[in-house]
Amino acid sequence: MAHAVKIYDTCIGCTQCVRACPTDVLEMIPWDGCKANQIASAPRTEDCVGCKRCESRCPTDFLSVRVYLGNETTRSMGLSY
């Protein structure tokens, strides 16, 4: 089962989500659009286990996790979009 990680533009570059992820799905990349000049990115979504630790640590609710089976969304993980 794959999980998709959606990054929103409210990231403040605090790195809380990156440090919370047990499977290193997230990383910080340079970004001119936020105060910290970096934003979370999810280059390894195939490693996401859907634990949502990143979501719970985020102070701005900037990301969400959805569960996918194949190419089709089968259920959301109780998040508002």
Swiss-Prot record:
Q: Which reaction does it catalyse?
A: reduced [plastocyanin] + hnu + oxidized [2Fe-2S]-[ferredoxin] = oxidized [plastocyanin] + reduced [2Fe-2S]-[ferredoxin]
List UniProt keywords, sorted A-Z: 4Fe-4S, Chloroplast, Electron transport, Iron, Iron-sulfur, Membrane, Metal-binding, Oxidoreductase, Photosynthesis, Photosystem I, Plastid, Repeat, Thylakoid, Transport
Residues bound to [4Fe-4S] cluster 1 are: C11, C14, C17, C58
Q: Which SUPFAM superfamilies match?
A: 4Fe-4S ferredoxins
Instruction: Name the needed cofactors.
Output: [4Fe-4S] cluster
Q: Which GO terms describe its molecular function?
A: 4 iron, 4 sulfur cluster binding; electron transfer activity; metal ion binding; oxidoreductase activity
* Entries under InterPro entries matching the protein: 4Fe4S_Fe-S-bd, 4Fe4S_Fe_S_CS, PSI_iron-sulfur_center, PSI_PsaC
Record localization:
Plastid, Chloroplast thylakoid membrane
Listed GO biological process terms: photosynthetic electron transport in photosystem I
Q: How is the cofactor bound?
A: Binds 2 [4Fe-4S] clusters. Cluster 2 is most probably the spectroscopically characterized electron acceptor FA and cluster 1 is most probably FB.
Q: How does it sit in the membrane?
A: Peripheral membrane protein
- Class in the EC hierarchy, top level: oxidoreductase
PANTHER family, per the entry: PHOTOSYSTEM I IRON-SULFUR CENTER, PHOTOSYSTEM I IRON-SULFUR CENTER-RELATED
Q: Can you state the subunit structure given in the record?
A: The eukaryotic PSI reaction center is composed of at least 11 subunits.
Q: What protein does this entry describe? A: Photosystem I iron-sulfur center
Give the species this sequence originates from. Marchantia polymorpha (Common liverwort)
Underlying gene: psaC
